[in-house]
C-alpha cells in the first residue's frame, strides 16, 4: 500500500495523490495544451493494471480527459472493488464533462460519489473558441446525467480576464440553480504561452471575489476539505464557492498533494520541473514496502514551493509542460 503518513522535507503531510490515466483529450483548451499537441506513444503510458498497483487510499483520477482512455470502465470497476473491500477510502474524478453522460451511471455504480467538471463559460460560441472545437451541450448533458445518477458535481472555472469576466455572475447563478458547488481557479503560467496572453488574461481571485461581492454577500465558512481552496458561502443562495489562488494567495506551505502522470512521473510540485520516474518499478511489478520506499524518497524531495509569478510586463516560473501532461 502507499505509505501513510507521508512527510516531505519541510514537515508537510502528503495525503493526496492525483493520478493521470492519459494525456489525451477530446478538447484543446488554450490554457491546457497546444492545438497541435503530440501525445505520448501508447507504450510509454502506464497500463491501468500498473496504476492499480499503487495501492492508494484516496484517489483522484485525472487526465487529459480520463474518460477517453480505453478500458477506463474496467479500471473504475477494479477501484470499486477496492472501495467495497476497504482498501480504498475515496474515488473521485476530474473531467471536462463531454463523455460524462455515457459514463455517469457506471461511475456511480463503481462507488464514485462526486466529480469535478471544468466549465469556464456558459456560452456555446465562447466555449467552442476556448476549447477550440468543443460542444457545450455535451457538458450540460454530462452534468445532468451525473446528478441523475446521484453524483455530486463541482464546477471548476478558470478566471480569465477579457474572456469570461463578463460571466462571473452568470456562472454563479447557473451553479446555484443546478445545485453545483463552484470553484474559481487562477491562471498559472504553464504550457504553451503566446506572447502576452497570460499577462492579459491573469485575473487575481481577490478581484473576482470583490466583483462577486458587488452583488452577493459572501461569508467565509472556514471549510477545510484538505485541498488548496478557500471557501465562502453565498448568503442569498446557500451555495458554496471556492477560490484556488496559487499566485495571489500562495498555499505552498500547506500543500499536501502530489501528481502521478500517465507516464509514471511523480511530480511533487506543479511549479517545478523536478520529478521521480516510478514507471520502471511499477513495470517491474514492485509492490508493498519496496514501492513505498521509492515513493517516500520521491516525496522527501518535494520543494518548498513553486516559482510562478506575474510581473507588470513579464511571466516568471513558466512550466513548459502542459497541464494535460501533468494531470489537471
Swiss-Prot record:
Role this protein plays: Catalyzes the cyclization of GTP to (8S)-3',8-cyclo-7,8-dihydroguanosine 5'-triphosphate.
Designated gene of the protein: moaA
Gene3D superfamilies given for it?
A: Aldolase class I (3.20.20.70)
Q: What is its EC number?
A: 4.1.99.22
Organism per entry: Rhodobacter capsulatus (Rhodopseudomonas capsulata)
Binding residues for [4Fe-4S] cluster 1 = 25, 29, 32
| Name of the featured protein | GTP 3',8-cyclase
Please name the SMART domains in this protein's record: Elp3
Q: Which SUPFAM superfamilies match?
A: Radical SAM enzymes (SSF102114)
What is the additional note?
A: Seems to be specifically required for the biogenesis of DMSO reductase.
Q: Which residues bind [4Fe-4S] cluster 2?
A: 252, 255, 269
The reaction(s) annotated as catalysed by this protein in its Swiss-Prot or TrEMBL entry are:
GTP + AH2 + S-adenosyl-L-methionine = (8S)-3',8-cyclo-7,8-dihydroguanosine 5'-triphosphate + 5'-deoxyadenosine + L-methionine + A + H(+)
**Assembly and interaction partners:** Monomer and homodimer.
Entry GO MF terms: 4 iron, 4 sulfur cluster binding; cyclic pyranopterin monophosphate synthase activity; GTP 3',8'-cyclase activity; GTP binding; metal ion binding; S-adenosyl-L-methionine binding
